[in-house]
């Protein structure tokens, strides 16, 4: 578990502090940006504790908002880089950290859309800890894992049903594209639930914590984008057999069957029954020249 330094705790934001800050900045949380601010100090300290950080970790936080989780992170680690898309929030956050954060820590804020983010200042990040905006949680998580291979672990808070999809095993009702693509990068598991009342405004859904640990990608001669294109095709028609669902991907049903058999996969199964390693093997046997127009070549 992350060690909180009791001798120099931050002054965390209370529910009243969050509302006062929002009023002063004329901020109203918007559905467009998926904003729901955490207003409970016990919740943010719990998130940091479950994240299992060390002081040496370099943490990247996406969507810091008014800084509730940021301040709790700075109790446990020496450096946090926050990525915020809202210019008003991004401009205010350094002042909040300066006034309330643990002395001697390093903090930077990057004004950017996390999905478009290409680089971060300073040392490579080792952990992602974030209350991700509900409406872009999956693309943000996958983008961060793809662009920052130095991320070895993380804990994200997302809508509960999204959490279920991220950690779902093959064959389960919620298993799908997010499950497979997350598994390409990391092993993921549910790490708890978070009730609506700890947020402002109070959402109509529960939230869930998902922890992940980086692992090597499956062995394959296909690139990541080639595997992901296959996954998208397999789940676009998830009730069909792979022979039928992958006809467009392979060029024909017969070509799809040939690729599946070469990979040791029964053509009559559905995509929801396969793990990420299975998809990696199938992608390596895609018939030559079958790539659709405009589809990018694979990347490791």
Swiss-Prot record:
Signal peptide: none annotated. Pfam families: RrnaAD (PF00398). S-adenosyl-L-methionine binds at residues 36, 38, 63, 84, 113, 131. It comes from the Bacteria. Keywords: Cytoplasm, Methyltransferase, RNA-binding, rRNA processing, S-adenosyl-L-methionine, Transferase. It catalyses: adenosine(1518)/adenosine(1519) in 16S rRNA + 4 S-adenosyl-L-methionine = N(6)-dimethyladenosine(1518)/N(6)-dimethyladenosine(1519) in 16S rRNA + 4 S-adenosyl-L-homocysteine + 4 H(+). GO terms for cellular component: cytosol. It is found in: Cytoplasm. It is an enzyme of class 2 (transferase). GO terms for molecular function: 16S rRNA (adenine(1518)-N(6)/adenine(1519)-N(6))-dimethyltransferase activity; RNA binding. Its EC number is 2.1.1.182. The keyword Cytoplasm applies. Its main location: cytoplasm. CDD domains: AdoMet_MTases (cd02440). InterPro entries: KsgA/Erm, rRNA_Ade_diMease-like_C, rRNA_Ade_Mease_Trfase_CS, rRNA_Ade_methylase_Trfase_N, rRNA_adenine_dimethylase, SAM-dependent_MTases_sf. Specifically dimethylates two adjacent adenosines (A1518 and A1519) in the loop of a conserved hairpin near the 3'-end of 16S rRNA in the 30S particle. May play a critical role in biogenesis of 30S subunits. Belongs to the class I-like SAM-binding methyltransferase superfamily. rRNA adenine N(6)-methyltransferase family. RsmA subfamily. This is Ribosomal RNA small subunit methyltransferase A. The lineage of its organism: Bacteria, Bacillati, Actinomycetota, Actinomycetes, Kineosporiales.
